Amino acid sequence: MKIAVCVKQVPDTTSPRRLDPATSRLDRSGEGAINATDINAVEEALRIKEAHGGEVVVVSFGPTKALDSLRKALAMGADRAILVSDEAAAGSDLVATSYALAKALERESADLVLFGQQSSDSDGAVLWSAVADRLRRPLVSQVADLGIDGATVTGKRQTEFGYDV
């Protein structure tokens, strides 16, 4: 089973955040780190790989600085890393980011694609749905427990009414 995990390099949450006055975007010149919930997704992919075999590929779209996050995922045990990068894409919106990630994921032909809950720099929590839509693949979000049985994937998520499976 090939599992792709999308990860994002975000500003270190322990340093102050500022807007770049020239671009009105988040200043990303300081220290960066792999997004915290993406670490959870990498760990889940590695757990699945350990139980069922396969390959874990981490994918990121961003500046070359994002290589730091990819290296962290490789150090955790991921097999390969892919960085999609273009300086002209700095500050890309949801549409451009989902397009770039979907194209990279199409080339990988992953059996399962995982994302973290949301990024700590924007709290958007919608990129995964845009990528799933572009890939024309089913989406299960907010998953707290993931199960694999052959070619069947099940997810359990908590709602205000209990659990959905």
Where is each model-derived feature located?
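N-terminal glycine-rich FAD/FM-binding segment characteristic of electron-transfer flavoproteins
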Residues: 1-165
